[in-house]
Amino acid sequence: MSLIPASISTAIADRAKILGTLETLVLGAAGGLLFLWANLPGGLISGAMVAVGIAALAGRPLHMPPILTQTVLVLLGITLGSLVSRQLIQHMSAYPLTIGLLALATFCMTFGSSFYLQRFHRWDPTSALLAASPGALSQITILAAEKGADVPAIAVVQTMRVIILTAALPLVLALTGIAPSAPPVFASVVASPLELAALIAAAIAVALLLRLAKFPASWMFGAMIASSVLHGTALIEGGLPPWMRGVALVGIGAVIGTRFARIRKSTLLSHVNAGLGSFAVAIIISAIFVAVILLTTNVRFADVVVAFAPGAMDAMLALALTLHIDPIFVGAHHLSRFVFVSITTPGIIHLFGRPQEDVDD
């Protein structure tokens, strides 16, 4: 008798998740198509993110299961890899200098934003440093829980930074003429069914290998590497059908938007000023380093802006796809920052965070 209520509650929970997933997909598609119809730059990803984010803040039980998120990341990686060309690879000579400056910029952004949060919002040093660290959100969240930091406040600041960048960056770049507002023109050749199957199989295989090796963003980068090799060696010439590329962009936007579903409205409102202020500090510091790179290298302005933007790796690569921006350059820099943040943040917290015992000790 006791098994019946348990089975019913499980079925209800599963049904709620399915309905939440369907609602997320419908809202994301509607928002993306609306922004695309309005000819807004980065319309599919920005529209999906805004629509899902607003619904999540309104209390809708939105949900994106891991299998759908992984599928979206694989499709995005395949599309990014198909854009790789010899001309883009030739620009890699500038990477050591720009990646070195990115590491320094990350260090300055972390301490600059942390100082702002401590000075003007009275945050404790540990929470401020973790909230100010750009990228590697999963590692930051785990470390915050271990150190007894204010996890909800950190989540608000980190999420706001990603949301603002993803929504505003395409619009700013387009309005200033730095990046085109029109959707990117992809190769008109679509891979044959056999090529498409081989492309997807190779993408999943490499992604699984990277996942076993604990490589960050393994689904997206694995697919990107496989696609780059197959297209770069001319083994496959065609790419994904347009509708698949659209699904990838809408999916990424929906995934970002669902982050608000995990944040209470009261928590968001209580930390919105901290999020906006720390974001402004990070952008000012990033702009200084972007200016230095523009004066010392021949890298395009738009490429540097997106590569140095303190946003999520998957979101920034999706923007690179929609704004005609070098995916290799952006990917290399965001991956480098991910590694830098993951390696250095525990040491920074140990040296500069509040002195206390770990929660799990």
Regions found by a protein language model. Give the residues of each.
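Intrinsically disordered, low-complexity non-transmembrane regions of multi-pass membrane transporters
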Residues: 1-26, 137-139, 150-153, 178-193, ...
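Transmembrane alpha-helix boundary signature
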Residues: 61-64, 82-95, 111-124, 291, ...
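Cytoplasmic-side transmembrane-helix entry/capping segments in multi-pass membrane proteins
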Residues: 65-77, 96-101, 122-133, 155-160, ...
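Membrane-embedded alpha-helical segments of transport systems
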Residues: 136-140, 155-174, 285, 313-315, ...
